[in-house]
Regions:
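Bacterial N-terminal signal peptides that target proteins for export
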Residues: 1-9
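N-terminal signal peptide c-region/cleavage motif recognized by signal peptidases
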Residues: 15-17
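A short, surface-exposed beta-strand/turn
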Residues: 95-113, 172-190
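Hydrophobic, aromatic-enriched interface-forming segments
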Residues: 141-182
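Charge-rich, low-complexity terminal tails
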Residues: 174-177, 182, 189-194, 249, ...
Length: 264
């Protein structure tokens, strides 16, 4: 099954000259604590993706008005995921929720509540939707479908990710992704990290009787393992490890649980 693809925004031309870019290669390898933080963010991205995927399926069963609810934002509340679908108000002072999908006992189990009239939100969902809008304007015009993700950052801000969406069965795109750090109110970009530059899209193939042992790719922009590398491992089928080589000649393994070890 092809996973969700949700970025129904009109993206504008490139415009990012005043934004702090996180392009500088780190001079020392990431510490175990930094690798653990990357694992945690990657795992949250993977959970977010599963929640948004199945919540979207649940809402689609109601034949929603997509024009009235072009945006979706997910949040983990009390150990369960909640995904809302709606739009910013014309005054841009609140988020109007038309559908709320709540996770049940299983990760893929979602129940949906429809709001008519829409419910107002001036908290997380409002700020997250503003953050998506703010970063999408900076990101610019895209030539392919992308998915957006918003996570709380470790220092009280918001992370906004744009990852390429899956368009072909069995092909899991890696690369061409970016992470923004945005102020908590969603209005200002603090920094932008280009995690990978190019997109690799190929279907893993093995000879009859063989099994895929793992994947491998190298980094040229940063000397770190990226959050989206962990996401890639956790969402790819079959579930196999990934070896990541960095420009400073270090080698890391991302295991199938998302944990990262430095091998060289």
């Amino acid at each position: 099954m092809i996973r969700r693809m949700m970025l129904p925004l009109v993206l504008l031309a490139w415009c990012c000259p005043l934004i702090a870019q996180e392009y500088k290669k780190e001079s020392t390898p990431p510490s175990p604590a930094q690798l653990a933080a990357t694992t945690a963010r990657g795992r949250m991205l993977a959970e977010y993706d599963v929640a948004a995927w199945h919540a979207t399926d649940a809402v689609e069963a109601l034949k929603p008005d997509h024009a009235a609810a072009p945006l979706s934002v997910a949040r983990k509340v009390g150990g369960k995921w909640e995904v809302v679908f709606g739009r910013l108000s014309p005054e841009r002072d609140k988020f109007l929720i038309l559908y709320r999908a709540s996770q049940g006992a299983a990760p893929e189990d979602f129940s949906v509540k429809k709001f008519d009239p829409p419910a107002d939100d001036r908290g997380f969902y409002f700020h997250a939707s503003k953050a998506i809008e703010t970063t999408a304007k900076d990101l610019g015009k895209l030539a392919r479908p992308y998915n957006s993700y918003v996570l709380p950052s470790e220092n009280g801000q918001l992370y906004v990710y744009f990852l390429p969406g899956q368009t072909t069965e069995g092909v899991y795109p890696l690369g061409g992704d970016v992470r923004y750090t945005v102020t908590l109110d969603g209005s200002t970009i603090a920094s932008k990290r280009q995690m990978h530059k190019t997109i690799v899209e190929k279907k893993d193939s093995v000879q009859p009787g063989q099994q895929l042992a793992g994947g491998y790719h190298t980094h040229v922009l940063n000397n770190d393992v990226e959050d989206s590398d962990v996401f890639h491992v956790l969402t790819r089928i079959p579930l196999v490890p990934e070896i990541v080589g960095t420009a400073d000649k270090h080698v890391y393994e991302i295991r199938t649980d998302g944990s990262i070890t430095r091998e060289k």
